[in-house]
């Protein structure tokens, strides 16, 4: 053997220089990695790891990647062995070796990744906490070294194991929770970087929230509400606002949130790295970074909101929801999806977990209010859909209060207050409120016919209207009344439910008056209104007086201040229940709703601020006057309906600027109350004496108020005998000449047999008084209007004596208004103009400011004798000839041929549509001939009459009485495009 090694091998080596088997063993790489692997472990289990040898092993693996699988296999086998022996120090060396491989051999990860995943699985399934910590830390390093989704499924398989470790309770497990949360933060980073959502993502979110709660519970209320972190108080201080908290839960302004800035996980101190609370905040921070899109945001918020429901963490002071969501919102500023958090919270109110729990809903709304205020402080406006959802929930709350028990009523009332707070914060942050008006119009368009639902819908929109009015001083509020909203409000004013009609008038008042409210004392409210102080103050007082009076009704009926109240208090409950329901319940519905809101938010307004009145267009004024006419002659009206009509009329008068000579509605504003007076004093079988008495009081109030606005002082002296007397036990005219309900009266007795007898006697006396001073009233009004309109007095008297007819028939339906003009058959026949004469007077597009309105297709309800002439129906040929005749007159008008701007063109289109179409429709309805040879109309026989009755289908139906309807034919209205073509043709 010595000969072979000493003589033979050297000789072979000198001859076979290329034989690798003959190289020295020190130069052979086959055995070297085993030696390096053996050197990284100390001689004893307690020995320190050799960092230099570990680094040398990794460098060797980087230079010899084909050896990495064998190195990984050795480490995996050694880890199994040491786990069985519970040698934690050796396991730590193995994990350190894998960590160095991840750092140095990143490009060769495919050679050892699966082996590392197997080792991590064994570590996480171990029973020792130290080994769990090593596994979590190594897994975090493995995740951060990923460059793609190759090992996403392998990482996903370990999510549940890490989440279980993160939920270990107790202070002794804080290091384990910190390590597991560090691993979870790495997983969230992986999902953000590689757009991959784990299947067990909900488990990650809940694990993070479990540790977030530990931090906040340990922090204590003192730190949570520390003044130096109170951003809410800073907002309140700058805005000069008082507390808005309504209810016993929490004052929103006294609740502060610690908004923490983002943390850098690589720059943490040792104490911070060992704190699970710090890592929980980092996880929330990375969740906010993960929510790049709205879909991802919802994916994150869904498990969060479900966790808050399950753990009852919605309370603003003791709960976790406000803390987490505020941090999410604050840290989400880079993506621009902050408002989605508020939207998701509001939509979560419909979730089955909280749908039937008013207390949890109240806590959620308080949280949403603070989130909305936080967004507003950063200049971020909430989505408009949030306001719509809040109104919907407010409607549900109001609807539930109709038939709730006392306990449920208190909970719903608290929820309602919090909804108002949240709605106020949302609307305050919206710069342009016009989309809100559009949303209100859409809601009113689909207003149901059921009284309870309709009242709740109107109530929610009424609160929104007052909020918009309250915040309109700082918003870009429109100077003109929204057209679409007005159309739907007018439609709601003829709703089947009488209280819904009152609510529609309240909405009109809240929208047309923008600015702070002026509170009135109870004594002034109960017995007399405040004196006329200024235009603006009285306007808003008029808009809110009705609501306040309704709210005070039950208190006044139940108090013992006067003898009348004592008498009503002594009445039995059964007698009151037999009365009309509206008199004791629904009459105070909207007042309790709105004035609770007004009282709570009175501190938000400054006494120096003045209210603004939204302007109305000419068409809108005509529609409102027509609406007041239609509503005033409804047979089921209550005193509150007449009061609402009177207040809406007063606001319309003030908005119309009657003292302006350019106002084309001056005559109609006086013609309407004069016509209502004539209707109230005309005996007929449709309106009851009680209604006629109320209409007379309403007409007197309207006439006196219009005269005061126009400074016709003599008119007030003439009407003093009607304004100061107590002829109506249910309605009175205050010192401001507006109509008010006598709340101390027995409202349930309105319309009874005894009341009808009293009303007949009162009407008889009124006929005598009116006959004496009627001509005097006409002279005074005509003389005053002469100076405003520059028209002849005789012409004004003639127009004032004509019966008012509604302008916009299609708005209320074909049979919704009464043709009261047939009360004066002979006068109408003598004074009527032929169609050609009327067209010649109003053929100019820009002229004819005082055009005759459209006469309603309904015939007179009077029982007086009328000519028994058969109505003549025009043929198709005659209708076409009439239309061509009018078109020829319009086309032949002298117009400048120069190019017109778009605004002028649209004005001509509107004038054309509201001019010639009215003349033609008025002529057709009244039965004029197509030639000027026969100017007298053919009046129908009075056998039947159609009384408008609202129902669920558009709120209208027809009820036939013993009168015959007149047959009338009307051309269909021209489309806006036709009007534009006609105006464009004229401009050429």
From Swiss-Prot:
One GO cellular component term: nucleus
Coiled coil ranges: none
| Phenotype caused by lack of the gene | Inward rolled leaves due to the presence of defective sclerenchymatous cells on the abaxial side of the leaf. Narrow leaves and reduced plant height.
**Localisation:** Nucleus; Cytoplasm
| UniProtKB keywords | Cytoplasm, Developmental protein, Differentiation, Nucleus
Polar residues composition bias: residue spans: 853-865
Q: Which organism is it from?
A: Oryza sativa subsp. japonica (Rice)
How is this protein named in the record? Protein SEMI-ROLLED LEAF 2
Please, one GO biological process term? Answer: pollen development
- Organs and tissues of expression: Expressed in root tips, and in the vascular bundles of leaf blades, leaf sheaths, and roots, especially in their sclerenchymatous cells.
Q: Which gene encodes it?
A: SRL2
Q: Superkingdom of this entry's organism? A: Eukaryota
Q: What does this protein do?
A: Functions in regulating leaf rolling through abaxial side leaf cell differentiation. May be involved in the transdifferentiation process from mesophyll cells to sclerenchymatous cells.
Annotated SUPFAM superfamilies: ARM repeat
Q: Which is one Pfam family of this protein?
A: EFR3_ARM
Q: What is its main location?
A: nucleus
Question: Which residues does the annotated region (Disordered) include?
Answer: 844-865
């Amino acid at each position: 053997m010595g000969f072979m090694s000493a003589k033979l091998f050297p000789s072979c080596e000198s001859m076979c220089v290329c034989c690798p088997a003959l190289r020295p063993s020190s130069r052979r790489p086959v055995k070297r990695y085993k030696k390096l692997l053996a050197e990284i472990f100390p001689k004893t289990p307690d020995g320190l790891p050799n960092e230099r040898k570990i680094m040398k092993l990794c460098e060797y693996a980087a230079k010899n990647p084909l050896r990495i699988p064998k190195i990984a296999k050795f480490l995996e086998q050694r880890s199994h062995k040491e786990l069985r022996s519970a040698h934690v120090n050796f396991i730590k060396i193995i994990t350190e070796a894998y960590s160095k491989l991840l750092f140095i051999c990143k490009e060769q990860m495919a050679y050892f990744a699966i082996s590392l995943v197997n080792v991590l699985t064994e570590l996480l399934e171990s029973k020792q906490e130290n080994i769990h910590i090593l596994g979590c830390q190594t897994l975090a390093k493995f995740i951060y070294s990923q460059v793609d989704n190759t090992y996403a499924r392998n990482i996903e398989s370990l999510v549940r194991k890490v989440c279980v470790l993160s939920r270990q309770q107790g202070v002794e497990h804080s290091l384990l929770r910190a390590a597991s949360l560090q691993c979870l933060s790495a997983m969230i980073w992986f999902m953000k970087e590689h757009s991959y959502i784990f299947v067990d993502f909900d488990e990650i979110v809940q694990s993070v929230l479990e540790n977030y709660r530990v931090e906040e519970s340990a922090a204590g209320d003192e730190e949570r509400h520390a003044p130096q972190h109170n951003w809410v108080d800073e907002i309140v201080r700058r805005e000069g606002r008082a507390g808005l908290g309504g209810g016993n839960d929490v004052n929103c302004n006294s609740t502060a949130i610690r908004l923490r800035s983002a943390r850098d996980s690589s720059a943490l101190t040792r104490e911070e790295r060992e704190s699970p609370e710090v890592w929980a905040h980092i996880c929330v921070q990375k969740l906010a970074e993960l929510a790049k899109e709205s879909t991802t945001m919802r994916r994150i918020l869904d498990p969060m909101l479900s966790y808050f429901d399950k753990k009852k963490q919605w309370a603003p002071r003791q709960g976790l929801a406000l803390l987490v969501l505020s941090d999410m919102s604050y840290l989400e500023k880079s993506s621009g999806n902050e408002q989605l958090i508020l939207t998701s919270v509001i939509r979560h109110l419909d979730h089955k977990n909280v749908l039937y729990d008013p207390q949890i809903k109240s806590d959620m709304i308080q949280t949403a209010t603070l989130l909305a205020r936080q967004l507003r402080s950063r200049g971020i406006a909430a989505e408009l859909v949030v306001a719509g959802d809040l109104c919907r929930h407010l409607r549900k709350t109001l609807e539930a209060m109709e038939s709730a028990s006392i306990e449920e009523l208190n909970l719903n009332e608290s929820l309602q207050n919090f909804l108002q707070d949240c709605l106020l914060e949302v609307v305050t942050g919206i710069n342009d409120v016009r989309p809100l008006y559009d949303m209100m119009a859409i809601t009113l368009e689909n207003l149901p016919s059921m009284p309870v639902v309709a009242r709740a819908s109107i109530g929610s929109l009424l609160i929104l209207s007052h909020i918009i009015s309250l915040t309109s001083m700082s918003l870009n509020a429109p100077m003109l009344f929204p057209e679409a909203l007005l159309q739907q409000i007018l439609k709601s004013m003829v709703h089947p439910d009488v209280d819904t009609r009152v609510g529609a008038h309240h909405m009109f008042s809240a929208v047309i008056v923008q600015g702070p409210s002026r509170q009135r004392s109870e004594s002034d409210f109960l017995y007399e209104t405040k004196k006329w102080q200024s235009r603006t103050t009285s306007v808003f007082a008029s808009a809110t007086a009705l609501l306040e009076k309704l709210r005070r009704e039950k208190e006044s009926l139940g108090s013992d201040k006067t003898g009348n109240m004592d008498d009503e208090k002594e009445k039995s409950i059964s007698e009151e229940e037999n009365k009309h329901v509206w008199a004791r319940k629904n009459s105070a519905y909207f007042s309790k709703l709105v004035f609770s809101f007004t009282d709570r938010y009175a501190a938000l307004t400054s006494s120096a601020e003045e209210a603004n009145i939204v302007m109305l267009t000419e068409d809108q004024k005509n529609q409102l006057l027509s609406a007041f006419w239609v509503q005033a002659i409804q047979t089921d009206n209550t005193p509150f309906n007449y009061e609402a009509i009177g207040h809406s009329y007063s606001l319309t008068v003030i908005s119309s600027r009657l003292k302006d000579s350019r106002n084309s509605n001056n005559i109609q504003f006086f013609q309407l109350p004069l016509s209502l007076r004539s209707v109230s004093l005309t005996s007929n079988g449709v309106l009851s004496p009680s209604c006629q008495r109320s209409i007379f009081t309403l007409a007197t109030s309207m006439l006196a108020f219009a005269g005061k606005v126009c400074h016709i002082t003599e008119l007030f002296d003439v009407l003093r005998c009607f304004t100061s007397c107590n002829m109506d036990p249910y309605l009175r005219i205050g010192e401001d000449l507006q109509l008010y309900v006598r709340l101390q009266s027995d409202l349930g007795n309105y319309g009874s047999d005894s009341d009808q007898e009293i009303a007949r006697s009162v009407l008889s006396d009124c006929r005598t008084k009116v006959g004496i001073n009627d001509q005097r009233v006409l002279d005074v009004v005509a003389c005053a209007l002469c100076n405003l309109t520059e028209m002849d007095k005789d012409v004004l008297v003639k127009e004032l004596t004509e019966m008012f007819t509604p302008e916009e028939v299609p708005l209320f339906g074909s049979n919704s208004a009464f043709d009261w003009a047939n009360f004066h058959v002979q006068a109408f026949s003598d004074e009527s103009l032929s169609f050609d004469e009327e067209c010649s007077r109003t053929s100019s597009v820009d002229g004819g400011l005082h055009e005759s309105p459209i006469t309603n297709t309904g015939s007179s309800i009077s029982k007086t004798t009328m000519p028994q002439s058969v109505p003549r129906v025009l043929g198709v040929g005659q209708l076409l000839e009439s239309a061509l005749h009018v078109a020829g007159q319009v086309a032949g008008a002298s117009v400048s041929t120069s190019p017109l701007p778009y605004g002028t063109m649209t004005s001509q289109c509107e004038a054309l549509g509201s001019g010639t179409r009215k003349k033609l429709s008025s002529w057709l309805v009244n039965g004029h001939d197509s030639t000027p040879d026969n100017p007298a109309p053919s009046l129908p026989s009075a056998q039947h009459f159609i009384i408008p009755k609202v129902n669920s289908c558009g709120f209208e139906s027809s009820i036939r009485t013993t009168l015959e309807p007149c047959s009338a034919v009307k051309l269909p209205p021209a489309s806006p495009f036709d009007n534009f073509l006609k105006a464009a043709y004229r401009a050429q």
